Structure formats: structure tokens, C-alpha cells
Swiss-Prot record:
Its main location: secreted. This is Ranatuerin-8. Signal peptide: none annotated. Keywords: Amphibian defense peptide, Antibiotic, Antimicrobial, Secreted. GO terms for cellular component: extracellular region. The lineage of its organism: Eukaryota, Metazoa, Chordata, Craniata, Vertebrata. Expressed by the skin glands.
Length: 13
């Protein structure tokens, strides 16, 4: 899993 996507999901959630 890409860290960039993980951060995006973290902000979205």
C-alpha cells in the first residue's frame, strides 16, 4: 500500500 494513499485515506476518514 502506498504511504501517500494511506495519508489521503487517513485525512478523509
Amino acid at each position: 500500500f502506498i504511504s501517500a494513499i494511506a495519508s489521503f485515506l487517513g485525512k478523509f476518514l
